[in-house]
């Protein structure tokens, strides 16, 4: 992975990790909690990183996401694929910045 996705990684590992329920029960609630605590510039960087990730083919995207999340989050139990999860993050955050 030659591009840094540190802001997205932090969002995923901290807000969607094992203690996700501290921040909400749905993806949208958790993202709203993220926006309440995070600098808007950092949230905008997450949107930009998600945009770059979404340009990847599905195999590379999945491999890169696994590296970013460090095994602490999988979107499938949330009814999402990696791609739909990142699209949801980008859409939700962008609409609120």
Give the location of each predicted region:
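Short, charged/polar micro-motifs that form catalytic or ligand-binding hotspots
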Residues: 2, 17, 33-40, 72-79
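Surface-exposed polar/charged interaction patches
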Residues: 15-18, 37, 53-56, 71, ...
């Amino acid at each position: 992975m030659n591009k840094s996705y540190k802001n997205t990684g932090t969002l995923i590992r901290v807000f969607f990790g094992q203690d996700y329920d501290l921040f909400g029960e749905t993806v949208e609630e958790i993202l709203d909690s993220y926006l309440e605590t995070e600098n808007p510039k950092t949230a905008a960087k997450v949107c930009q990183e998600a945009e770059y990730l979404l340009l990847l083919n599905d195999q590379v995207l999945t491999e890169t996401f696994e590296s970013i999340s460090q095994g602490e989050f999988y979107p499938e139990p949330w009814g999402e694929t990696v791609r739909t999860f990142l699209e949801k993050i980008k859409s939700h955050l962008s609409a609120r910045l």
